[in-house]
């Protein structure tokens, strides 16, 4: 593991014509890399005239950018930094106050936002008070990491297996008889025949259920023997025939007759004509 740290690949670029190696070593040491003095960094100067870094893709563990002048923004190189860094690699960016037009806090927020938009993770500011970087007085810095995955990489997602819940349908059924009480189980008493009101004259009640009302209705349909032997009429129209009789007339259906005379029926009155 220590050997890997000693052999870490470092790329540093700046807009100056000269960049001391000691500045790069001190910057790498701040990352906690042991044996930073033994690293062999690649240095690119006057990078403001470049549109592409002259290194292979995914070949660097650390990339350091040092910006001193306002003319060299270096923002167009963020994509190049992401290209040359290995997955999980680190980028360090240092800017002097002369290289920014706004204040320090605004410049730090703008730089952090640009790093996040370029795809870097864990962007955070650096405390330069403890750094001994030559020529970087009155400056601010920030570091970030490239994601550990490669662009275009894919992996299979594990589908969560849903366990089937066993449901016993019999447990959901309720015996209806268990909901009934002893009073509910008793059969209702059956009303005896002729249960209408008992009085001086037995007659069907209003809500008759014993059949007395039907029997009384049948009696009312035809004239009694007393009415046949001694016909009488309260309206005076019973003997004129059905055309003059009311709907409840007991003589309805009988031939016309004279009141006070005995009504006699022929022997074949109920016999069929055919």
Swiss-Prot record:
Q: Which domain of life is it from?
A: Eukaryota
**Sequence segments annotated as region (Linker):** 154-185
List, alphabetically, the Gene3D superfamilies matched.
Vaccinia Virus protein VP39
List the record's Gene Ontology CC terms alphabetically.
Answer: cytoplasm; mitochondrial intermembrane space
Among Pfam families, the record links this protein to: Anamorsin_N, CIAPIN1
The segments labelled Fe-S binding site B in the record are 235-249
* Chief place of localization: cytoplasm
List ligand-binding residues for [2Fe-2S] cluster: 196, 205, 208, 210
UniProt cross-references to InterPro entries, sorted A to Z: Anamorsin (IPR007785), Anamorsin_N_metazoan (IPR049011), CIAPIN1 (IPR046408), SAM-dependent_MTases_sf (IPR029063)
- What keywords are annotated for this sequence in UniProt? 2Fe-2S, 4Fe-4S, Cytoplasm, Iron, Iron-sulfur, Metal-binding, Mitochondrion
Q: Fe-S binding site A: where is this region?
A: 196-210
Q: Which residues bind [4Fe-4S] cluster?
A: 235, 238, 246, 249
Motif range for Cx2C motif 2? 246-249
The cofactors named for this UniProt entry are:
[2Fe-2S] cluster; [4Fe-4S] cluster
| Subcellular location, record wording | Cytoplasm; Mitochondrion intermembrane space
Question: Which GO annotations describe the biological process of this protein?
Answer: iron-sulfur cluster assembly
MF GO annotations: 2 iron, 2 sulfur cluster binding; 4 iron, 4 sulfur cluster binding; electron transfer activity; metal ion binding
Q: How does it assemble?
A: Monomer.
Protein family (similarity comment): Belongs to the anamorsin family.
Task: Report what the protein is called.
Answer: Anamorsin homolog
């Amino acid at each position: 593991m220590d050997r890997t740290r000693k052999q870490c690949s470092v790329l540093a670029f700046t807009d100056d014509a000269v960049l001391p190696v000691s500045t790069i070593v001190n910057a790498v040491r701040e990352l906690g890399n042991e044996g930073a003095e033994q690293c062999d960094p690649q240095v690119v100067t006057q990078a403001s005239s470049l549109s592409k870094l002259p290194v292979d893709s995914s070949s660097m563990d650390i990339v350091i950018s040092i910006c001193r002048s306002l003319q060299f923004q270096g923002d167009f190189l963020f994509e190049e930094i992401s290209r040359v860094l290995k997955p999980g690699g680190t980028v360090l960016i240092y800017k002097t106050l002369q290289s920014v037009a706004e204040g320090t806090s605004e410049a730090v927020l703008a730089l952090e936002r640009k790093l996040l938009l370029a795809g870097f993770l864990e962007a955070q500011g650096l405390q330069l008070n403890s750094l001994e970087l030559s020529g970087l007085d009155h400056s601010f810095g920030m570091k970030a990491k490239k994601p550990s995955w490669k662009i275009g990489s894919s992996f299979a997602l594990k589908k969560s297996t849903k366990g089937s819940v066993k449901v016993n349908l019999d447990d959901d059924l309720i015996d209806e008889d268990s909901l009934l009480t002893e009073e509910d189980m008793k059969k209702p008493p059956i009303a005896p025949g002729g249960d209408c009101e008992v009085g001086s004259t037995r007659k069907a009640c209003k809500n008759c259920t014993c059949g007395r009302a039907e029997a009384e209705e049948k009696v009312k349909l035809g004239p009694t023997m007393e009415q046949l032997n001694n016909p009488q009429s309260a309206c005076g129209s019973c003997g004129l025939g059905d055309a003059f009789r009311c709907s409840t007339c007991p003589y309805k259906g009988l031939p016309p007759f004279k009141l006070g005379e005995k009504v006699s029926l022929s022997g074949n009155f109920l016999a069929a004509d055919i």
